């Protein structure tokens, strides 16, 4: 998705029509021969998944040193990812991170994508966060974490892994955006995808991540940088799990019959079907809210829409926090990939809300953890 947004072809060359566009520089580095390489590092403890990238459509895009894999997986075990198998590859990973950091003109921070439920996503990610905090203490660290869904479990020990990784990373991460597989599955069904594949799920997550990072990559009238997310959304360091919502999520069939105004997409962001995590916001209170608009949006419409949301009073704010909405506006409209079920729209909004309602997600996880641990299931 980033490649399409910045006009970068699968072999790393820039599209001829985008030669004057410098927006790619923040997430891609340019080589001496003029091709672009993503500023990314992909790590997995087992080689299978990364092999598919090395042989896939984008095999020429990545530098071989940016795809690091071990010889055996963590077997859905946090301890293997953190203490045994993960320890074996942490040094080459950190060395590559140092090399990439040196290649940046002004490093702002890190975006970490991982899952809570698996052994690598939980164990190795927390080990790496520990090392990042030690070496790059002052740099922002934003996480995008796939949270175990209530009904869709890929491993029976997910509650153990999730609790352990959250405990470890709580003090190292500045802001953590949770994504719940079940909520994404529901979005896929609304888009008319009856049997979603991982590709469909990842594409929805990619749209959300793209909206959050758009202001880091493209010029806009009201841009938000990495440290501003932290400043505006996190009142206390440990309460750093904003609820993410995205609108509009339209299928191509529906898009032909709807012309969504700024007000309508803003209202939709506060509806349950737009949320990335299953929880009831009416039962919680908001501590902070950030609305990131992109596309054909003028500041006047955005301010009117947020004022109307405030006036409704259905979204309760805590007494000790002003009812301010941080607004970001970026003029680049959302891009959709070929074959994607989601329709191309002229404007979209991503809402990041720090609300007490997200505690529902943690309660579900705690209950499962307690249930298993009380029986000493899988404890050795």
UniProtKB/Swiss-Prot annotation:
Keywords: Cytoplasm, Cytoskeleton, GTP-binding, Hydrolase, Magnesium, Metal-binding, Microtubule, Nucleotide-binding. It catalyses: GTP + H2O = GDP + phosphate + H(+). One of its GO terms (cellular component) is cytoplasm. Mg(2+) binds at residue 46. It holds the Pfam family Tubulin. Its EC number is 3.6.5.-. The active site is at 228. It is an enzyme of class 3 (hydrolase). SUPFAM superfamilies: Tubulin C-terminal domain-like, Tubulin nucleotide-binding domain-like. This is Tubulin alpha chain.
């Amino acid at each position: 998705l980033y490649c399409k947004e910045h006009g970068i072809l699968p072999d790393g060359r820039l599209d001829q029509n985008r030669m004057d566009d410098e927006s790619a520089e923040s997430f891609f580095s340019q080589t001496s021969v003029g091709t672009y390489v993503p500023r990314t590092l992909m790590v997995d403890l087992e080689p299978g998944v990364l092999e598919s990238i090395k042989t896939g459509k984008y095999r020429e895009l990545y530098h071989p040193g940016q795809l690091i894999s071990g010889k055996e997986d963590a077997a859905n075990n946090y301890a293997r990812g953190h203490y045994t198998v993960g320890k074996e590859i942490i040094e080459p990973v950190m060395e590559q991170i140092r090399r990439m950091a040196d290649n940046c003109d002004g490093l702002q921070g890190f975006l970490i994508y991982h899952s809570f439920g698996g052994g690598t996503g939980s164990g190795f990610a927390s080990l790496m966060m520990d090392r990042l905090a030690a070496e790059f203490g002052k740099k922002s660290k934003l996480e995008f974490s796939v949270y175990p869904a209530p009904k869709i479990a890929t491993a029976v020990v997910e509650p153990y892994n999730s609790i352990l990784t959250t405990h470890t990373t709580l003090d190292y991460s500045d802001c953590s955006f949770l994504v719940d597989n079940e909520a994404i599955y529901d979005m896929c069904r609304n888009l008319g995808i009856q049997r979603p594949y991982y590709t469909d799920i990842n594409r929805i997550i990619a749209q959300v991540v793209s909206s959050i990072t758009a202001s880091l990559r493209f010029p806009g009238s009201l841009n938000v940088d990495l440290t501003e997310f932290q400043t505006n959304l996190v009142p206390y360091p440990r309460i750093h799990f904003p609820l993410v919502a995205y609108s509009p999520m339209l299928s191509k069939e529906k898009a032909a019959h709807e012309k969504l105004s700024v007000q309508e997409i803003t209202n939709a962001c506060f509806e349950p079907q737009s949320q990335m995590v299953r929880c009831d916001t009416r039962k919680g209170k908001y501590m902070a809210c950030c609305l990131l608009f992109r596309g054909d949006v003028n500041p006047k419409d955005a301010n009117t829409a947020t004022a109307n949301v405030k006036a409704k009073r259905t979204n309760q704010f805590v007494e000790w926090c002003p009812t301010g909405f941080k607004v970001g506006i970026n003029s680049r409209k959302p891009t959709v990939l070929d074959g994607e079920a989601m329709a191309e729209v002229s404007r979209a909004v991503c809402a990041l809300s720090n609300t007490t309602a997200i505690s529902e997600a943690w309660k579900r996880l705690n209950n499962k953890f307690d249930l298993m641990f009380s029986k000493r299931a899988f404890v050795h």
